[in-house]
């Protein structure tokens, strides 16, 4: 489409349908700043998820996702100006243009350092199958969300966050909702929709 540079690229979490295209993007597009809930160690190598590691299938799947994410960072790191790991303990506010601002919202703050410790251990070769399975199941729980403000309108991008993680004061009314997690029942509850009161909703069904 003629795009050769992105000022900011935000990754919400590490499931294949959210980071699987990162390599293809970085092949042809430079990125000023990559925002992510986890940045692999600079010297990290391939995880070899399908090697003879004795891990159960669910744990291997987590390693595949992390390899799919970390691989392009190794190959195309020179195409990224800066990688910023978001701490997860406070809302991040960005002014994207004079008219457009964005809040990045997180799940439970305690999730992110725990998740970081498990992923760091995996890249060091310390692979605890139980921990990997647990955090594989928790990827959606720790998914980032965004709220954009443009000329008096508010647009909420729900990522894959589960509804119970933000049926709180952060779920205030909006104009447009990008429905979380393909409108799954665990992420799009009646309570959440009552809180958000969107005038329009967009659903992704072909991830």
Show where each model-derived region lies.
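Flexible, acidic/histidine-containing loops and adjacent segments that form or flank the divalent-metal
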Residues: 19-20, 24-155
